[in-house]
Amino acid sequence: SKDGKIGLLSVGMSNTTQEYSLFKPLADADAAKSPRVIVVDGAQGGQAAIHWVDPKAPLWKTIDERMKAAGLSARQIQVAWLKQATANPAKDGDFPQHAKVFQENIVKGLANLKEKFPNLRIVYLSSRIYAGYAKTPLSPEPYVYEEAFAMRWLIQDQIAGKPELNYDAAKGEVKSPLLLWGPYLWADGETPRKADGLIYKREDLRDDDGTHPSDTGRQKVANLLLNFLKTDPTAKSWFTGKLSKAGAR
């Protein structure tokens, strides 16, 4: 319906909730955001990709509570931002093995998301920020950079018609939402990214572990996500509530 709510859910681990909890007030205060869009932080500390594989995991109850607190039902969750990683990825081998394990876990998590939120139509995929300052094996380079390939493979597999990622009821049982690229958050430390000059300084990551974002790192991601949702051709019409001229015909 034209006045129905659009639940926008985050899916991911500690970094994701830390960034999304800064994105939410930023988005809610932005005049460009449609009042129909309700931002809900489903991401949770310690809940890396493998934890979303179990449909009975405690994390789902937490999402349910947060969703209800935001005044939403499961059927109103229509869009998600999935930013995931593998905890201690070295255990899964070198590239591409660890990225394949990561991809398989996300596929199973997506099936659970679609089952629990039947009107979840789009999931925007992001891999994590630079991890070259990491002091622990939790989520270091080069694994973090390489995890973006799993996101690419997910999108490619869906385009290729893999049944476990089918989003089109005309082609069989729907197992997944539509997968689209979200904002790409990685940049090579202090080397400016060609597209937009993005860098990550040491102070953009926390002092203690160099793995989780500091307040400045969180702000960078929140800004990137908000800008993406306001400008991406697949997102801006529902996020701002303004149909493009093509869509309004």
Residue map of PLM features:
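Sec-exported extracytoplasmic/periplasmic mature domains
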Residues: 16, 24, 28, 32, ...
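Alpha/beta-hydrolase-fold catalytic nucleophile elbow
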Residues: 83, 125-126, 182
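Extended catalytic cores and adjacent scaffolds of nucleotide/polyanion-binding enzymes
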Residues: 95, 123, 137
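Aromatic-lined carbohydrate-recognition surfaces of secreted/lumenal glycan-active proteins
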Residues: 118-127
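Catalytic His-Asp segment of secreted/periplasmic serine-dependent ester chemistry enzymes
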Residues: 129-247
